[in-house]
């Protein structure tokens, strides 16, 4: 289920639009998650990963950054990640068309609060079970969800570390992993060549032995 949607300007973390669903039955305090989202916006910068999932216990934040604007959604952790990012891409496309040119000029929080109407309509589309099945069958080219950076929201906020630093660490780990695979491949090739050389030496010695003793 989609519980909270927020849109903010990356340059200064200014909230541009939002839509929150009160969930009285389960007693969830979405104000806490909204506060975490605002803290997250203030940590974003131009070097932050453009696609990210932040785990928050039974919930998960997903966000995308396009043209200096961050689109963030809070979902139950079990909500399909692919649908969450498809939902964000849908919002991004419409918001950019309606308000994209005005984003750099506004100074008042929630200047585009009227965009909530579109958010609510789109959210219903992605929550409806039949619509979700149809959307799930579409071969979208949004991104490979397996490659999206995943972190923990509490660690990110408490550590006081910019998401760009986390992204840098993720890239370093990826580089180290790639180097390890290359080194392993090189060692395997050397081992194979050594075995072939040993076999060649054996046959050469055998030929020399036969020629020397039998001819």
UniProtKB/Swiss-Prot annotation:
Membrane-topology annotation of the record: Single-pass type IV membrane protein
Record protein name field: Vesicle-trafficking protein SEC22b
Role this protein plays: SNARE involved in targeting and fusion of ER-derived transport vesicles with the Golgi complex as well as Golgi-derived retrograde transport vesicles with the ER.
Topology, Cytoplasmic side: 1-194
Family, as annotated: Belongs to the synaptobrevin family.
UniProt keyword terms in alphabetical order: Coiled coil, Endoplasmic reticulum, ER-Golgi transport, Golgi apparatus, Membrane, Protein transport, Transmembrane, Transmembrane helix, Transport
Compartment(s) where it occurs, according to its Swiss-Prot or TrEMBL record: Endoplasmic reticulum membrane; Endoplasmic reticulum-Golgi intermediate compartment membrane; Golgi apparatus, cis-Golgi network membrane; Golgi apparatus, trans-Golgi network membrane
Sequence ranges assigned to domain v-SNARE coiled-coil homology in this UniProt record: 134-194
Main location class: endoplasmic reticulum
GO molecular function: SNAP receptor activity
A UniProt-annotated Pfam family: Synaptobrevin
Subunit: Component of 2 distinct SNARE complexes.
This protein's record includes keyword Chloroplast: no
Spans through the membrane: 195-215
Positions of the Longin domain: 6-119
GO biological process, one term: vesicle fusion with Golgi apparatus
Keyword Membrane belongs to the record: yes
Annotated GO CC locations: endoplasmic reticulum membrane; endoplasmic reticulum-Golgi intermediate compartment membrane; ER to Golgi transport vesicle membrane; Golgi membrane; melanosome; SNARE complex
């Amino acid at each position: 289920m989609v519980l909270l949607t927020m849109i903010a300007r990356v340059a200064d973390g200014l909230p541009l639009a939002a839509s929150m669903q009160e969930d009285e039955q389960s007693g969830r305090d979405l104000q806490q998650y909204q506060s975490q989202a605002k803290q997250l916006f203030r940590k974003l910068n131009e070097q932050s990963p453009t696609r990210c999932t932040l785990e928050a216990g039974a919930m998960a934040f997903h966000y995308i950054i396009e043209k200096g604007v961050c689109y963030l959604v809070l979902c139950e952790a079990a909500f399909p990640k692919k649908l969450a990012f498809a939902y964000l891409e849908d919002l991004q496309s419409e918001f950019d068309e309606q308000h994209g040119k005005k984003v750099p000029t506004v100074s008042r929080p929630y200047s585009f609060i009227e965009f909530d109407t579109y958010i609510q309509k789109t959210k219903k589309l992605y929550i409806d079970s039949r619509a979700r099945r149809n959307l799930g069958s579409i071969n979208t080219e949004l991104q490979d969800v397996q490659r999206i950076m995943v972190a923990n929201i509490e660690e990110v906020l408490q550590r006081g570390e910019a998401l760009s630093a986390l992204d840098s660490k993720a890239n370093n780990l990826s580089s180290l992993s790639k180097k390890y695979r290359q080194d392993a491949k090189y060692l395997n090739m050397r081992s194979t060549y050594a075995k072939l050389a040993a076999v060649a030496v054996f046959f050469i010695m055998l030929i020399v032995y036969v020629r020397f003793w039998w001819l």
